[in-house]
Amino acid sequence: MGNPRPRPLRLAEKLLQIRNGLGLSQTQMLERLGLGDTMHYGRISEYEQDKREPSLITLLAYARAASVHLEDIVDDDFELPRRLPGNVNYRGIKKSNRK
């Protein structure tokens, strides 16, 4: 089966930094992540207090919301940017169906 991976030591700190950097409440963060239908806003608090580790899907949603690489969030050797690129009303870029 292999060895369990080490848990990132700064994950909770970085998730809180993302939410604060985006200027969002916990409820707004949940909406921004697009996970409001699947989890309660209290889960955001649990992530930020290091009481629970988010799933990969949730971490990907954080990375998209903040417009940063997933590696920046989960790798303790990487720092998040001081200003998050996602602090504008980011809804993604619509892909063209042109060929």
Residue ranges of model-derived segments:
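A short, Lys/Arg-rich alpha-helix, primarily the initiator
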Residues: 1-22
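Short, charged recognition helix plus adjacent turn
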Residues: 2-5, 64, 74-99
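Residue-level signal for the short linker/turn that defines the boundary of a DNA-recognition helix
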Residues: 10-13, 23-24, 39, 54-57
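Residue-level recognition of specific faces of alpha-helices
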Residues: 14, 43-46, 72
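Key DNA-contact positions within bacterial/archaeal DNA-binding proteins
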Residues: 27, 38, 42, 71
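Short alpha-helical "recognition helix" segments of helix-turn-helix
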Residues: 29-33
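Recognition helix of helix-turn-helix/homeodomain-like DNA-binding domains
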Residues: 34-53
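DNA major-groove recognition helix of helix-turn-helix/homeodomain DNA-binding modules
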Residues: 51, 55-72
